[in-house]
Amino acid sequence: MNPSPARHSPFQAILPLCLALLFMAAASPAAPVFRYLEQTGTDSFIFTWRLERERDTATLSVVQRQGSETFLSRNTPAGDTLAWQYVHQPDTDVRAERDGDRIRLSGRFRGRKVDEVQTIDDRPWFQPLSFSLRPLALNGQATTEFWTIRVDTLELVAMRAEAAGREEIHTVRGPRLAAAKVVIRPDGLLGGLWRAEYWFRAEDGQFVRYRGTHGPPGTPETVISLLDS
């Protein structure tokens, strides 16, 4: 005797649809990718910048391609950096992580092994400044002091940032926009010898421009501009 046909539950029919909707609801929306043009003298290249948010932290991934170079940092929403990684193939993959008033660096940097601890104080660690300076630009705070890692040497340096008001700036592709300006300098006696400037879009804090010199007198100025506004 042939078995009677199985009776199909209405739930079985809609189960795939329910699961699909559940996965769509759980998935985070794709983080927007911003493109920037960096120019130093006659040299220029484009890099990408992406901010991925999680529940109570912000993970900022900056992908910069001049050859093969990648920056990845894990920050609090207030801009403080908890961990950072810098990869430049084939000989650099270095990680930094904060533990109290110490930052441990490990990995390889330009072919040499790195395993060291640098002592700081209770000032925040900012990396990258294109994200970490955003609260200063938007919240009306006048100044802040912080630590940051020099990418070319892995040295931790103390810096000072000052809000410098708002102004309209030209964009590479698009109309003028209102931007909040932040000026950074080395903390202490060297503060009068070097400075750089950041601009953040007034409406949402997105980094839109940088201007500074990376070298001795006579070095061409470096300008970074948002391409996708």
Predicted regions mapped to residue ranges:
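Acidic, serine/threonine-rich low-complexity disordered tracts
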Residues: 30-101, 143-229
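Sec/Tat signal peptide C-region and signal peptidase I cleavage site
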Residues: 24, 28-30
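N-terminal secretory signal peptides that target proteins for export/translocation
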Residues: 1-10
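Bacterial N-terminal signal peptides
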Residues: 13-24
